[in-house]
Regions:
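Charge-rich, low-complexity N-terminal segments
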Residues: 1-119
Length: 119
């Protein structure tokens, strides 16, 4: 069984590894959507796979670290691709949730997404 929580944030980034004049090289921003999924069987005492209030609080911390920031300036996001952003969020949340199953980061306006499952 899987439960999930979604949140969004807006941030800017650039990719210095692209040639001069390439659209990705310049600073630009996106609205990102994140889905955090936890898997397991419901706890017989609570009926929950995870306390979604606790998940929401943890995601609020992640959101505050990313929202309206230059992603390149955040430790571990020098190359802020969807892939690296998914991994960064995983690493931020995994210590708090042993049953973390997947992180999906989307840029819906671009039709793009990346899902990381710990492998």
């Amino acid at each position: 069984m899987e439960v999930s929580y979604k949140f969004g944030f807006d941030a800017a980034h650039h990719f210095d590894n692209y040639p001069e004049g390439h659209i990705y090289r310049g600073v630009h921003g996106h609205s990102f959507q994140v889905e955090v999924a936890l898997a397991g069987e419901p706890d017989p005492k609570t009926g929950f796979v995870a306390d979604l209030g606790e998940v929401e609080r943890a995601c609020r911390d992640v959101r505050e670290s990313l929202d309206h920031r230059m992603l390149n300036e955040i430790d571990g996001l020098a190359l802020p691709s969807l892939e690296n952003l998914s991994l960064w969020i995983w690493r931020a949340l995994k210590p708090r949730f042993a049953n973390l199953a997947r992180i999906t980061v989307r840029r819906d306006s671009q039709g793009q997404s990346c899902t990381y499952t710990g492998r």
